[in-house]
Amino acid sequence: MSSAFEAISVAKIFRRRWSRREVRALQNVSFTVEPGSIFGLLGPNGAGKTTLVKIALTIAYPDQGEIRLLGESVRNRSILKRIGYLPENPRFPSHLTAWQVLRLYGSLSGADIRTVEKNATKWLARLDLEQWRDTRISTFSKGMNERLAFAQALVHDPEFIFLDEPTDGLDPLGRMEVRSICSELARQGKTIFINSHILAEIELICDRIALMKSGEVIDQGTVAELTSARGGYEVVVPAGDGLSDWLHEKNVSFTFLDGHLHVQAKDRASANWIIDALRQKNIEIESVAVKRRTLESVFIEKVSGGEENPAAKGTKNT
């Protein structure tokens, strides 16, 4: 098996019944996910992330292309027994207890009931729900319900796990535990596919990332690859009389911090010009540093059509 997940030219069009208007939810989407990795799918609301996952789970069907999971087409529905899924807004029968939920959903996957019960005990303890195992979930908080849904996705010991906004409703300790579990599962050879818009979570945990916008994959790679381009330069000098006015006149961006001016340059040529000008004014330069782009800045640039923050382009910023 070369890929745990493979999207091949997937397209999906939704048609409005009355207006006959077409909404292209997915347009020729293609990418792969390697076995034993943690993959993140990022994009704004309406980008097509959830539609793609629904097609992978056969909840929806493509108008073009196909998705393969664990080396097999999802048209072979038996593959779904090896898949775990945490939906964005999990809902369980409110009259059931936590134990009953895990036992029911685990058995629906076709797994041996003894394996399901063993795993249910394990994940209830790991996710701090053991004391609530016989409590009806109608009394659960949002965070407790989210942890139960995470346990549900794992209770049948799947090889591939889809997680849709897995840390929604969790406190910082809960989010850290989810990241820890995902890393452990990946080390065991399982593949994790995270659909999220929380950039910090994705940046912390994912091996590779794909960015989606308007139904298309607009970029993909590791965090290092996506953020490798320089985000400009920063020149730090002591704040002196008249210097800020001079920078304003030259339309150069800077910030004031702890008695120093942090002068921004969008590229090497701009940085060299600023350095030469400061030296001609006999101003001591304390440091010059290359600024690396963050995943957040890459995301904003990509989904907004390439427009970066004006402060990165040499405009005033006081």
Task: Label every PLM stretch briefly.
Residues F5-A7, K12-K213, D219:
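ABC transporter nucleotide-binding domains
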Residues E66, R91, G240, K266-A269:
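Short coil/turn segments
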Residues S73-V74, V217, P238, R268, ...:
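Short, surface-exposed acidic/glycine-rich loop or hinge patches that mediate macromolecular interfaces
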Residues R75, E201, G242-L243, S270, ...:
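Short phosphate-engaging motifs
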Residues H95, V236, Q264, V288-A289:
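Active-site-adjacent beta-strand anchor residues
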Residues K266-T318:
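C-terminal coupling/interaction segments
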